[in-house]
Regions:
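Transmembrane-cytosolic junction motif
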Residues: 18-39
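Short, charged beta-turn/beta-strand-edge "cap" motif at the junction between a beta-strand
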Residues: 112, 124, 170-174, 221-226
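FNR/FR-type flavoprotein reductase catalytic core
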Residues: 200-293
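Membrane-cytosol interface motif
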Residues: 33-54
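Ferredoxin-reductase
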Residues: 129-216, 270-272
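Feature marks short, highly hydrophobic, charge-poor N-terminal signal-anchor/signal peptide-like helices
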Residues: 1-10
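Iron-sulfur (Fe-S) cluster-binding segments and ferredoxin-like electron-carrier domains
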Residues: 53-64, 75-125
Length: 293
């Protein structure tokens, strides 16, 4: 009897939850809402009811987000100054106490139901959406590929050594985005090159490893705080391995393009010699620049 009561109660709660979701989606009308960004640097109007993340993307504000609204990547953090409603249980596990106190929220979980004021890092205002085509695919090891994107629109990218892009890939529940470091040097502005390890069952890496020359791709960027120290007096020590060599390669080539005499050490970590790649390129670079070890 108790089991039957539990089943009935659970069914009622599930039914009510589904009804509320449907009602909110199709019956709730929040009208026009205004979002004020960074104290008025940008101001845009939209129909309320969707997520803050969707609202930002629709207005070409491409903040980081890996899973498109599932609330588990923690990347889409913004500061809500006004109008975000109460903090949700789906957000609290991913926010520190200090973040919760300062109004940090997950944009994928916050619904736009009224006028809002938010803040995001200034640099995210300059993130762009790129359309490109695959111009090269090269197998580096048994599970790592180098994939080159030729930029179409816009046809140039401006990034700093160490930054990354977010590639859009088709997933079972819709489009997902995955972050990959840029391996091509900053002076190669018409391409973006990635070094990607195939993760068994991974949506993003499987998609990229299956790309062929001529395939269209879409991504946003650049993002990231992992950057080269631009003080020419600072000696650089680069440590990496596997797909983690992508930003290291970008950093090394960018260093010697800008500072011919700057000192740089490279330590390439691997399990076997078969896991080493780009060695010929680095050896050639060391012949041109004796400060590269």
């Amino acid at each position: 009897m108790n089991v039957m009561a539990l089943v009935v109660t659970t069914g009622v709660f599930v039914g009510l939850s589904v009804w509320f979701l449907i009602a909110e989606r199709y019956l709730a009308n929040y009208g026009k809402c205004t979002i004020k960004l960074n104290e008025g640097d940008k101001l845009f109007e939209l129909n309320g009811g969707g997520t803050l993340l969707s609202a930002l993307y629709e207005n070409k504000i491409f903040i980081p987000s890996a899973f498109g609204g599932k609330g588990s990547c923690r990347y889409c953090k913004v500061t809500v100054v006004e109008g975000g409603g109460p903090l949700l249980p789906t957000e609290t596990p991913y926010l520190t106490r200090a973040e919760r106190m300062s109004g940090v929220r997950l944009a994928c979980q916050v619904k736009v139901k009224q006028d809002m004021e938010i803040k995001i890092p200034e640099e995210l205002l300059y993130v762009q959406e790129f359309q490109a085509r695959v111009s090269g695919v090269k197998e580096l090891t048994r599970d790592i590929k180098e994939v080159t994107f030729e930029l179409i629109e816009p046809n140039e990218i401006s990034h700093r050594p160490g930054q990354y892009v977010q590639v859009r890939a088709p997933g079972p529940d819709g489009i997902v985005t995955r972050a990959y470091s840029i391996s091509s040097p900053v002076y190669e502005k018409n391409i973006v090159q990635l070094v990607v390890r195939l993760v068994p069952g991974g949506i993003g890496s499987t998609y990229i490893h299956n790309l062929k020359e001529g395939d269209p791709v879409s991504f946003t960027g650049p993002y990231g705080e992992f950057r080269l120290n631009e003080d020419p007096e600072v000696e650089n020590v680069c440590v990496g391995g596997g797909a983690g060599m992508a930003p290291i390669r970008c950093i090394i080539y960018s260093i010697f393009h800008r500072w011919l005499e700057r000192s740089c050490w490279l330590f390439f970590g691997c399990r076997t010699t078969k896991d080493i790649f780009y060695m010929e390129n680095y050896e050639e670079l060391s012949k041109k620049h004796t400060n590269f070890k």
